[in-house]
Amino acid sequence: MRRIGRVLHLTPGGMLIVRAEKTPNIGETVVDDNLKQVGTVFDIFGPVSSPYISIKPTIPDPATLLGKTLYAVSRREGRSWRRRS
């Protein structure tokens, strides 16, 4: 689990905008302090030195996340990956 930054604002289209401390991969799961899934990384934009992240929320009221710190969880964390035979 990696800290990605604080939520700055909510777009009219319902996306959360976060200023990135560490850049996650597109498609990674995003969780809050309580490890509750809040969305997925949709886009990364802005200058390379201080990028912004657009997160597509999966919760009914994303406005409650304004000002909160979010974390990225890679797909392999918390799961065991075995090849099916």
Question: Where do the PLM segments sit?
Answer:
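Peripheral interaction segments used for macromolecular assembly
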Residues: 1-85
